[in-house]
Amino acid sequence: MILYDAIMYKYPNAVSRKDFELRNDGNGSYIEKWNLRAPLPTQAELETWWEELQKNPPYEPPDQVELLAQELSQEKLARKQLEELNKTLGNELSDIKLSLLSLKGDYAE
């Protein structure tokens, strides 16, 4: 158990060295000073908070490389869709031009 993380899970606004101080003399970490307006937590409470923290880890933002990879993938997809749309519109424009030319040819006679 990481004592600091367990305390911060229960008291997220607590400030280390102001609201509490931890110490380790070689026999494990313990709370040396407790200045929060709450009872000093028992070992059982600390372990419960630690277990809850393990079940519900705090949100970690995605890695910048992952974000860039997602953006690149979305841009590639959008580009492919635009290229297909451009091709379709180009084909339709060609058909319209041919229709106009054939209509002009009909009137020229």
UniProtKB/Swiss-Prot annotation:
Pfam families: XkdW (PF09636). SUPFAM superfamilies: XkdW-like. To B.subtilis YqcC. This is Phage-like element PBSX protein XkdW. The gene is xkdW.
